[in-house]
């Protein structure tokens, strides 16, 4: 399972860099585990070059028993007897009703990913099909993502829509008090600032300082400590954009593990903005640009393990995500070398009044459920 979590983390940083090419300074928020799960379902029915490209881009080549590992991971994430937080990862295929999908593929998808095939009439009722898909996603994300497919996203030529939704709502183990929240400036870059609702608390929390990139790392656990938000904050803005350039260049699985391994509980004065991010991505161009091109090309895609025919291809991967961070905790949804320890003072400052990276981690499996950059209110 650790190999699978590592693969998903590798992929999340690769995808972040790709998204960054067209959005170097804006807010970013997506669920790598959600996108990886969706594409792993496609991989079950992919063959030849198409399968090789998916495996390579998602770093699945090093993962033994990939699909049974996903089955275990999904079961761990979707634990039913947890009362302290809500976390739901849901998958579904919507296929054109006249199109024949192979029984072996359907049973494998059901067994490994708990995903059913919903049959819809794309040919003569594409708009009704779109509404049905949106309703399903809205239900899975508790209404936070009401419309994953916008008007015109499907048409009479659509054969298959792959939908993956993830929803999370959790309370902080140590909540911020609402009376401590105040209007404060948030520095976007060296020249601009905006006002945010800045939360505050002083608590004993896992903390680390990374001198080589002048960054602070803070872990904010959720109730029961099964999940945490980890925030990586540069000391200040030292470049001409968000102040995150050096940190983003250094991002890797190895570095993140290194930075978060040696965290020490210490009294920290935490200043963190309340924020809400919503993002929508059409990932076809990014994934194709990363080397997963065949899947989206009629004539090149080999999904013969799904249907036995050669005319099936994926037209788009649409991913929508939502996160809200407040005094109580977080609500989020998405669809489709040793470290030199600095001499720690008794108290540390963690003032997130300028751009930072953050991720929400499932601690037992070390899986990054959500990854984001907060750079502008």
Curated annotation (Swiss-Prot):
Keyword list, A-Z: Acetylation, Cytoplasm, Protease inhibitor, Serine protease inhibitor
SUPFAM superfamilies xref list: Serpins
UniProt subcellular location: Cytoplasm
Alphabetized GO MF terms: serine-type endopeptidase inhibitor activity
GO cellular component terms attached to this protein's record: cytoplasm; extracellular space
Site (Reactive bond): 344-345
PROSITE patterns the UniProt entry points to: SERPIN
Major localization listed first in the record, in broad terms: cytoplasm
Modification type N-acetylmethionine: residues: 1
SMART domains: SERPIN (SM00093)
Similarity-based family: Belongs to the serpin family. Ov-serpin subfamily.
Role, per record: Regulates the activity of the neutrophil proteases.
Protein name: Leukocyte elastase inhibitor
């Amino acid at each position: 399972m650790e190999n699978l979590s590592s693969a998903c983390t590798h992929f999340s940083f690769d995808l972040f860099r790709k998204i960054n090419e067209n959005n170097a300074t804006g807010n970013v928020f997506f669920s790598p585990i959600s996108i990886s799960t969706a594409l792993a379902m496609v991989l079950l029915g992919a063959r030849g070059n198409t399968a090789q490209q998916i495996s390579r881009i998602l770093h699945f080549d090093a993962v033994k028993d990939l699909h049974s590992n996903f089955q275990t991971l999904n079961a761990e994430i979707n634990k039913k007897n947890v009362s302290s937080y809500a976390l739901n990862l849901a998958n579904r295929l919507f296929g054109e009703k006249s199109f024949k999908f192979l029984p072996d593929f359907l049973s494998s998808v059901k067994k490994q990913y708990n995903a059913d095939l919903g049959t819809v009439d794309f040919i003569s009722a594409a708009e009704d099909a779109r509404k049905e898909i949106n309703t399903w996603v809205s239900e899975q994300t508790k209404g936070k993502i009401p419309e994953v497919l916008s008007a015109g996203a499907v048409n009479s030529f659509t054969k298959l829509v792959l939908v993956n939704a993830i929803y999370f709502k959790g309370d902080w183990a140590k909540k911020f008090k609402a009376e401590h929240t105040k209007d404060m400036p948030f520095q976007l870059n060296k020249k601009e600032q905006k006002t945010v609702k800045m939360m505050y608390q002083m608590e004993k929390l896992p903390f680390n300082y990374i001198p080589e990139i002048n960054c602070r790392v803070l872990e904010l656990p959720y109730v029961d400590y099964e999940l945490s938000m980890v925030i990586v904050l540069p000391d200040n803005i030292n470049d001409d954009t968000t102040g995150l350039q050096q940190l983003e260049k250094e991002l890797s699985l190895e570095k993140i593990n290194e930075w978060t391994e040696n965290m020490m509980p210490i009294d920290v004065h935490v200043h963190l903005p309340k924020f809400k991010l919503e993002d929508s991505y059409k990932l076809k161009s990014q994934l194709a640009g990363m080397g997963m091109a065949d899947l989206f090309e009629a004539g090149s895609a080999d999904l013969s393990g799904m249907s036995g025919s050669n005319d099936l291809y994926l037209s788009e991967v649409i991913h929508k995500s939502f996160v809200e961070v407040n005094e109580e905790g977080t609500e989020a949804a998405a669809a489709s070398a040793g470290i030199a320890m600095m001499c720690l003072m008794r108290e540390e400052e963690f003032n997130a009044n300028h751009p930072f990276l953050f991720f929400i981690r499932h601690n037992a499996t070390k899986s990054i459920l959500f990854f984001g950059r907060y750079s502008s209110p």
